[in-house]
Amino acid sequence: MPVLVLLRHGQSQWNLENRFTGWVDVDLTAEGEAQARKGGELIKAAGINLDEAFTSVQTRAIRTGNLALDAAGQSFVPVTKDWRLNERHYGGLTGLNKAETAQKHGEEQVTIWRRSYDIPPPPLAPGGEYDFGKDRRYAGKDLPDTESLKTTLTRVLPYWETAIAPKLKAGETILVAAHGNSLRAIVKHLFDVPDDKIVHVEIPTGNPLVIDLDADLKPTGARYLDAARAQPLPAVG
């Protein structure tokens, strides 16, 4: 039966600095690299043989996937990159320190932007420091200027349905190395998590989440490979 392994990228430099990262291409810290390797070691220890991997076009996710595959002894596994697996676009909050933003706009407003399901932050102004339309990896793409978790899911799911789900339905074991919110979108879809509950689902960095699926891609079981760093999971069935 198909198996899906979700792996959130290891700690990035802006995670460490408590900044809204979103689509900014920030690299892993040394700790983040270690988390990615540990994730791969856990995959190897669990005896999971991957058939294919998917990741975003952001360096922190790409490197997490590569480091994990190498540590798992499976660096030969083909990897497909697509921008639709990117992190949520934080719009006008991009690059800002989270604590300073709360002081400026109020804790309640920032919490709404971060944790509501369908309320996005203010849009990113065009032509500024973080104008992703200038980045050639997004050439010809219709890009958002901000996203809520709801619109992140709207972006992720078509790619899931056309690229990843068919591989799983063929019985493959798939790794998706991506980001907290793009992975949260997949979890919401698979487990049918209510809108008001998904914003509270946390996915820890560098800890492989293994989801066993039936032929219809309904979860039959789910577990984190590092139990000591696990977070609560949605109910199966």
Curated annotation (Swiss-Prot):
Organism: Caulobacter sp. (strain K31)
Subunit structure: Homodimer.
HAMAP family: PGAM_GpmA
One Gene Ontology MF term: phosphoglycerate mutase activity
GO biological process: gluconeogenesis; glycolytic process
Any matching Pfam family: His_Phos_1
Binding site residues for substrate: 8-15, 21-22, 60, 87-90, 98, 114-115, 180-181
Protein name: 2,3-bisphosphoglycerate-dependent phosphoglycerate mutase
EC number: 5.4.2.11
Residues forming the catalytic site: H9 (tele-phosphohistidine intermediate), E87 (proton donor/acceptor)
Keyword presence, NADP: no
Task of the protein: Catalyzes the interconversion of 2-phosphoglycerate and 3-phosphoglycerate.
Keyword line: Gluconeogenesis, Glycolysis, Isomerase
Substrates-to-products reaction catalysed: (2R)-2-phosphoglycerate = (2R)-3-phosphoglycerate
Gene3D superfamilies: Phosphoglycerate mutase-like
Family of this protein: Belongs to the phosphoglycerate mutase family. BPG-dependent PGAM subfamily.
Source species, domain of life: Bacteria
Pathway recorded for this protein: Carbohydrate degradation; glycolysis; pyruvate from D-glyceraldehyde 3-phosphate: step 3/5
Family annotation (InterPro entries): His_Pase_superF_clade-1, His_PPase_superfam, PG/BPGM_mutase_AS, Phosphogly_mut1
Record's keyword annotation contains Disulfide bond: no
